[in-house]
Amino acid sequence: MSIAYNKIAVRVRLGALRRNFETLRRMSPAAMPVIKSDAYGHGLLPVARTLEAAGADAFAAGTVGECAQLRDGGIPGRIVALLGATDAADAECCVARSIVPAVYSADQLEMLAGRAAPGQQVDIALKFDTGMARLGFSEADLPALLDRLHARPMLRPVLVMSHLAVSDDPSRSDFTRQQGEAFGRILAGVRADWPAAQGSLANSAALLAHPELHFDVQRPGIALYGANPLRGTAQEHLGDGLQPAMDVAAPILQVHPLPAGRSISYGRTFTAPRDMTVAIVATGYADAYSRGLSGKGAMTVHGRRVPILGRVCMQMTAVDVTDVPGVAAGDDAYLLGGPGEALTPDELADLWGTISYEVLCLLGMNPRTHRE
């Protein structure tokens, strides 16, 4: 999906993605890249093809529709739909295209079993809740679930999954350990009947910081795209080798003086304390560049950090280029990345008051190009 009729350019560096994947695979050779939500805004198929060429043999996406795009795009290996089959059409698609759906309800078991052809086996991923309280069977559900599976031999659990709630916070490692212990018990229970079932618990933070929770398959997400899930913690150094893979730029429309005492933008929230030079950049909240950055965000122009002045508008934002010589209309202003004093996804998220995941998913909705 792309935001139309704007001037933003999103440039995805596939080489950085590949290097991040290679870094993570050195820690966990069985890493299954998570490329849900259009690969966190980086482009589903280009990212999948790059990582497949780098050695990835399985992927996890969000919806069955995304998984179908991967299959139709020529991705041959295991593809896991993390949201599972949410309706009959999803179930039919999973069975027909060999997509592995997460299963977290008895209704989903029935939908999938009812669509298997005679003699066909349908691979599924059993999703358990070990502390996230989101999707999944409980540990107490396990005996009844195993009985249901035995009664439906066309369904084959190839993966057992759960999700960690605070693996990115070393101060709450006790809860992460409790989740790991619960998952270990669940996995052992499933393997008593299906010994080939693989366990998958570790997300990006656990891949970096909790090798004891790697089990068989790891699911790196945000770390693939160069954001450090352990930033701001005592374990931040574990993600030091990750490289942001997205640059976002917009053209400067005009450069003009702002005399001392003159205000700028809606609401007159900023008044120049001295004679200044401002650049008007062709981006705003209609381009998924948050209005919350008004008066506190920054961009990079000619490799220098420049602060936002006043309110972010629908399609325009003003920045202070007083101390940056030679700025002219047509020059690029970098909202994210770029040369020099580049803003990382984590830094922009701090200014935005959110997390790097949201920054990448939203800005990635703008027109994209891919390069090495």
Swiss-Prot record:
Recorded name of the encoding gene: alr
Q: Catalytic activity, per the record?
A: L-alanine = D-alanine
Which segments of the protein form a coiled coil according to its record?
none
Specify the protein name: Alanine racemase
Q: Which cofactor does it need?
A: pyridoxal 5'-phosphate
Q: Which molecular function terms from Gene Ontology are attached?
A: alanine racemase activity; pyridoxal phosphate binding
What the entry lists under PANTHER family is as follows: ALANINE RACEMASE, ALANINE RACEMASE, CATABOLIC-RELATED
Family indicated by similarity: Belongs to the alanine racemase family.
Question: What does the record list as GO biological process?
Answer: D-alanine biosynthetic process
N6-(pyridoxal phosphate)lysine PTM positions: 36
Q: In which pathway does it act?
A: Amino-acid biosynthesis; D-alanine biosynthesis; D-alanine from L-alanine: step 1/1
Highest taxon, organism lineage: Bacteria
Top-rank EC class of the record's enzyme: isomerase
What residues bind substrate, as annotated?
A: 134, 314
Which positions are catalytic residues? 36 (proton acceptor), 266 (proton acceptor)
Query: Which HAMAP family does the protein's record reference?
Result: Ala_racemase
